[in-house]
Amino acid sequence: MTAHIITGGGTGIGAATARLLADAGDDVVIVGRRAEPLLAVAATHERIHAITADAADGVAMADVVASTTERFGGVAGLVANAGGHGYSTVGSTTDDEWRSSLEANLTTAFVAIRAALDELERSRGAIVVVSSIAGLAAGPETAGYTVGKHALIGLVRSVARDYGRRGVRINALCPGWVRTPMSDEEMSVLVQRGDAPDVESAYALVTRDVPLGRAADAGEIAATIAFLLGPASTYVHGATIVADGGSTIVDVPTLAYG
C-alpha cells in the first residue's frame, strides 16, 4: 500500500486531484501551509489525509515523506502543485518579491521532488509538476511568476534525464485558465479595474480568444494529472503537456480576421 502526495492540496487543482484520486481508491496526503483548507478537503473523503507544512522547507518535506511512508508503506506519486501569483515587472520587482515568487513557484517543486525521490525510486512512481501556460509564454507584469513557471519545465527535464532509468517518471502540466480561488482573485482585478462587471464576465473576457471558449474546471485538470500518474501513461516521460483549451495554438496576429 502506498499513497500520493500533493503539495498545494488545500484548494483548486490540488484539492480536485486529491478527491479524484481518493474516489479511485488511492490514499492521498495533501500538504499546504494553511491548516483550515487542508482539513476541509480531508473531511470530504476518508482517504484524504492532511499535513500542514511548507513545501519549500526541506526538513518539513522530508518529514512529510517519512510520515507518508511510515503510515502507507511508500509514495506512489507526487503532484508538485504549490505556487502563487504576483504582479510586477522586472523593474518594479523588489529583491524580496523576487525571492518569494521563485520560492513559491519553483523551490516548492524542487524541494518536494528531492524529498520524495528515494521513495519514488523504490515504488517506481510518477511525478507531475503543475506549471502553467505562463511557463510557455509571458503575460503582462508577472515577472517572477513567469520565470518560475518556465523554470519548472527545466526542472522536469533535468529530473527526467537523471531518474528515468531509476524508475521514476516525471512530466510537466501547463494548464490555461482554470476556475480556482486563485483565478477568481485574478478575475477580481479585472472587475476592480472596470474591465468587466463581475467575475463571470471577467472569465468570459480572458477566454474570448481561447478556441474552446471557456476556462477549465479544476476537475478537468485533475483528470489529466491522474492520467499522468497512472498506468495509461507509462511511456510519457519528460514531456510538457498543455491543457489550455487550445489557447497556445492561436496565431495571435490573425485574431483580427476572426
Give the label of every model feature segment.
Residues 89-90, 97-102, 206:
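Substrate-binding pocket helix/loop in short-chain dehydrogenase/reductase
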Residues 113, 148, 156:
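Active-site helix of classical SDR
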Residues 79, 164, 169, 236-238:
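Short, small/polar-rich loop/turn modules that mediate ligand/substrate recognition or access, typified
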